[in-house]
């Protein structure tokens, strides 16, 4: 399953103490395939370095830069689908370019992009994505 994960969810799913940790585990085990553009990876790196101690952050960044875990996606067209926080457009553009099944985010700025009929991208909350993972992998 191809996904793009917004930074707010990624940062919160890494710790085993969060309810979203199953997302990180699904990523590490290859149950989901994470797609990220260079701009997305740079944002991940910036915020991981802010949130975690240097050694842990370095290990997380190494995983995020490993092509066995993350598929780097080039962006060929900028849709400008999110007007409230234009910085979030990189996630939308990555999802469109990669053909991702979902953008996983808890950010309300993505609501405007949900209403687009083209290009259609499934934008869901981390809670909804957990339910999808549960239904797919807890059979």
Predicted regions, residues:
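A secondary-structure boundary/capping signal
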Residues: 6-7, 36-37, 106-107, 125-126
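PIN/NYN-family metal-dependent endoribonuclease catalytic core
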Residues: 5, 21-49
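Conserved beta-strand segments of alpha/beta enzyme cores
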Residues: 33, 69-71, 122
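Hydrophobic/aromatic ligand-binding patch that stacks against planar heteroaromatic rings
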Residues: 26, 64, 94, 115
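Active-site neighborhoods of divalent-metal-dependent phosphate/nucleic-acid chemistry enzymes
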Residues: 69-103, 108, 112
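Acidic, PIN/NYN-like endoribonuclease modules and their adjacent C-terminal/linker elements
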Residues: 82, 108-139
